[in-house]
Amino acid sequence: MSNIYQIYLISDSTGETLDRIFTAIKAQFKNIDYKIHTYSFTRTENQILKILSNAKENQNSIILYSIVDSSLAKYLARNSEEKKIPCFGVLGDLILSFSKLLNQKASHLSLIHISEPTRHA
């Protein structure tokens, strides 16, 4: 069995968020061998099925995703589970928690990272 981990970073935008998160994760573990597969602007079920098919063919696949469309995120999670591929959403729980704390519904819009003025209270 190969000890090279196949890391799938799936985003509905540029993938910058996932890249930074995986950088933080891999800093916590010494001596891991991995290959990154980056999929940006993933916004359809068909795209997800193609990615999952590829991930299933490889050993040691792990999926990290940042997809703000909740139905598409659930689709990815459900299909990953069916294929027994570990899959972790990095934004869903945070968006839900902030929505509750701020007493606002999240827009669930995917945005390309742009500079925005910092707001201070």
Question: Model-derived features: where do they sit?
Answer:
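N-terminal accessory targeting/assembly segments
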Residues: 1-25
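Short, surface-exposed connector motifs at secondary-structure boundaries
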Residues: 3-6, 32-34, 56-62
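Helical mechanochemical/support elements of P-loop NTPase systems and associated helical scaffolds
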Residues: 14-18, 47, 72
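Extended, charged alpha/beta regions that create polyanion-binding interfaces
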Residues: 43-45, 52-112
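Single conserved hydrophobic/aromatic residue that forms the stacking wall/gate
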Residues: 112-121
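Short, solvent-exposed amphipathic alpha-helical segments in soluble enzyme
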Residues: 23-28, 79-82
